[in-house]
Amino acid sequence: MSIARRTTLSKFLIEQQRETNNLPADLRLLIEVVARACKAISYNVSKGALGDALGTAGSENVQGEVQKKLDILSNEILLDANEWGGNLAAMASEEMETFFPIPANYPRGEYLLVFDPLDGSSNIDVNVSIGTIFSVLRCPDGKQATEESFLQPGTEQVAAGYAVYGPQTVFVLTTGNGVNCFTLDREVGSWVLTQSNMQIPADTREYAINASNARHWYDPVKRYVDELNAGKDGPRGDNFNMRWIASMVADVHRILNRGGIFMYPADKRTPDRPGKLRLMYEANPMSFIVEQAGGAATTGTQRIMEVQPTGLHQRVPVFLGSKNEVKRVTGYHDEAK
């Protein structure tokens, strides 16, 4: 791809704004600011031990998870980049117990930004791909946000995306008009369009799940995975491969490129906790992206984006990816009711 013919993220968004007329200028600017923050996070991640940002920070987030130094730094980068631009009413993050209203000394906009600043951070110290996930909603109360302002189903998202900090740094985005992938050109500092209209194959022979939890699974999940593992001699009549990175952004990015199903089910260890992944800033944005790429995403019993949130840090079971496999495992849950 010649430099002269490259489409940068800024150019892509401006063209979308002109062609479809459904990408408001404030939303375009917000996406560009988030992408710029992801560049800064990528830079800090890539420094590794040289940047004195590896290891734990000696604190826990609202979920009781030990925070890594890069968790906190990435959260601060996203807050600092977005608080002053005038596009947001408030932000919410995995790393903060409550929402962050835009300070009174800055102009406020009509959007809400929800994010997981560094997904897969347990992999930081071993140099496995990690990333940032974000979701954008309109503030129903204008520019004066409350916690309830965020509690909208995923169908209300106006944009969602993620960045993967791996061998290449990529930024995947949807505004409800397909899914596109941009790769960071570090020499010039630009996001360059490298994949357009990404599509997930309807069928797959790959699945992603943490098999070490198999003894805790409920029957529908156990039935589904047992059938996959039975291979050609089993009821599916085909061989399946398991892939598990323990980094949602990396697993979903693989599925977006070559198909597969990602599963993080609820299990019997904590019957009162419906799953581990957070609805607002993990499941919803990833579901929006996957559906826009022709895939499906459910909790096992309902479409993820139709779940009505009850809290910023609500958890849900997640089954997403290739449409026919998601349909099958969801059907097994229906049969077990």
Curated annotation (Swiss-Prot):
Indicate whether Flavoprotein appears among the record's keywords: no
Q: Which GO terms describe its molecular function?
A: fructose 1,6-bisphosphate 1-phosphatase activity; magnesium ion binding
Per the annotation, how and in what number is the cofactor bound? Binds 2 magnesium ions per subunit.
Give the pathway: Carbohydrate biosynthesis; gluconeogenesis
Q: Which InterPro entries does the record associate with it?
A: FBPase_C_dom, FBPase_class-1, FBPase_N, FBPtase
Q: Which cysteines are joined by disulfide bonds?
A: none
Residues the record lists as binding Mg(2+) 2:
116, 119, 282
Q: What is its EC number?
A: 3.1.3.11
Question: Can you cite a GO biological process for this protein?
Answer: fructose 1,6-bisphosphate metabolic process
Q: Which family does it belong to?
A: Belongs to the FBPase class 1 family.
Q: What is this protein called?
A: Fructose-1,6-bisphosphatase class 1
Species annotation? Burkholderia cenocepacia (strain HI2424)
